[in-house]
């Protein structure tokens, strides 16, 4: 028997219900900044999940962009290397 089946049988009592999934999707939807997803209309779970993935990707891109800008600023600033090292250590 595969370990996946074993785990599935062992955790049978802890399976997530459709209601719990719906609640989690609703919570995800509340976290999304998209105004169009905030309507009271029922939005398909697949759309909420897709929008969540898109939002996470955009956040990753924003972090990358800000990190690059910060690196450029640190490289051109007049601060001492000790000060720059402190700032870098705080950011990592």
Swiss-Prot record:
<keyword id="KW-0341">Growth regulation</keyword>
<comment type="subunit">
    <text>Interacts with APG.</text>
</comment>
<dbReference type="InterPro" id="IPR036638">
    <property type="entry name" value="HLH_DNA-bd_sf"/>
</dbReference>
<keyword id="KW-0539">Nucleus</keyword>
<dbReference type="InterPro" id="IPR011598">
    <property type="entry name" value="bHLH_dom"/>
</dbReference>
<keyword id="KW-0804">Transcription</keyword>
<dbReference type="GO" id="GO:0006355">
    <property type="term" value="P:regulation of DNA-templated transcription"/>
</dbReference>
<dbReference type="GO" id="GO:0005634">
    <property type="term" value="C:nucleus"/>
</dbReference>
<dbReference type="Pfam" id="PF23174">
    <property type="entry name" value="bHLH_ILI"/>
</dbReference>
<feature type="domain" description="bHLH">
    <location>
        <begin position="5"/>
        <end position="59"/>
    </location>
</feature>
<feature type="region of interest" description="Disordered">
    <location>
        <begin position="1"/>
        <end position="20"/>
    </location>
</feature>
<comment type="function">
    <text>Atypical and probable non DNA-binding bHLH transcription factor that acts as a positive regulator of grain size. Binds the transcription repressor APG and forms a heterodimer of antagonistic bHLH transcription factors that regulates grain length and weight by controlling cell elongation in lemma and palea. May be involved in the control of lamina inclination through brassinosteroid signaling pathway.</text>
</comment>
<protein>
    <recommendedName>
        <fullName>Transcription factor ILI6</fullName>
    </recommendedName>
</protein>
<keyword id="KW-0805">Transcription regulation</keyword>
<dbReference type="GO" id="GO:0009742">
    <property type="term" value="P:brassinosteroid mediated signaling pathway"/>
</dbReference>
<comment type="similarity">
    <text>Belongs to the bHLH protein family.</text>
</comment>
<dbReference type="GO" id="GO:0080113">
    <property type="term" value="P:regulation of seed growth"/>
</dbReference>
<dbReference type="InterPro" id="IPR044293">
    <property type="entry name" value="PRE"/>
</dbReference>
<dbReference type="GO" id="GO:0046983">
    <property type="term" value="F:protein dimerization activity"/>
</dbReference>
<keyword id="KW-1070">Brassinosteroid signaling pathway</keyword>
């Amino acid at each position: 028997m595969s370990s996946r089946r074993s785990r599935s049988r062992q955790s049978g009592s802890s399976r997530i219900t459709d209601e719990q999934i719906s609640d989690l999707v609703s919570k995800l939807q509340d976290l999304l900044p998209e105004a169009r997803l905030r309507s009271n209309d029922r939005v398909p779970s697949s759309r909420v999940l897709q929008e969540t993935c898109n939002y996470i990707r955009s956040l990753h891109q924003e972090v990358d962009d800000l990190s690059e800008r910060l690196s450029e600023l640190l490289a051109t600033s007049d601060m001492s290397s000790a000060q720059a090292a402190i700032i870098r250590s705080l950011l990592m």
